[in-house]
């Protein structure tokens, strides 16, 4: 199992806009239905951090995959390219990058999982 994170550093106050993009709340955001139908996709979460001692916020996009190949197939798909503005003519024209300072992508192989023990009463 593979976990991919995209940690997006944004100016204070810009996180809600980024979150709306990934949840589709803008009406033109991340196609959550499309990713949910990708073979090998296991889950998607958004995390939001507001460090009090920093002048920025972070939105961490996490996705869980059966394999590296499954995740790479998503990145190569037309749905991914459309959602991320990677069409021939739109890459530099995207206004929805406002407030984004930078980002870092990391890949992790899951080496251990501990699930809760369910005790029947």
From Swiss-Prot:
The record's annotation in PROSITE patterns points to: ABM
UniProt GO BP: heme catabolic process; iron import into cell
Q: Which GO terms describe its cellular component?
A: cytoplasm
Site (described: Transition state stabilizer): 74
The subcellular location is: Cytoplasm
Which parts of the sequence are annotated with region: Disordered?
A: 76-98
Residues binding Fe cation are 6
EC number(s) stated in the UniProt entry for this protein:
1.14.14.18
Catalyzed reaction equations: heme b + 3 reduced [NADPH--hemoprotein reductase] + 3 O2 = biliverdin IXalpha + CO + Fe(2+) + 3 oxidized [NADPH--hemoprotein reductase] + 3 H2O + H(+)
Q: Where does heme bind?
A: 84
- Write out the GO MF terms: heme binding; heme oxygenase (decyclizing) activity; iron ion binding
Where in the numbering of this chain does the ABM domain appear? Answer: 2-101
| Sequence ranges of Basic and acidic residues compositional bias | 78-98
> Which controlled-vocabulary keywords does the entry list?
Cytoplasm, Heme, Iron, Metal-binding, Monooxygenase, Oxidoreductase
Primary role: Allows bacterial pathogens to use the host heme as an iron source. Catalyzes the oxidative degradation of the heme macrocyclic porphyrin ring to the biliverdin in the presence of a suitable electron donor such as ascorbate or NADPH--cytochrome P450 reductase, with subsequent release of free iron.
State whether it acts alone or in a complex, and with which partners, per the record: Homodimer.
Family per record: Belongs to the antibiotic biosynthesis monooxygenase family. Heme-degrading monooxygenase IsdG subfamily.
Q: Which HAMAP family match?
A: Heme_degrading_monooxygenase
* Name of the protein in question: Heme-degrading monooxygenase
**Which species expresses this protein natively?**
Listeria monocytogenes serovar 1/2a (strain ATCC BAA-679 / EGD-e)
Per UniProt, what is the name of the gene that codes for the protein in this document? isdG
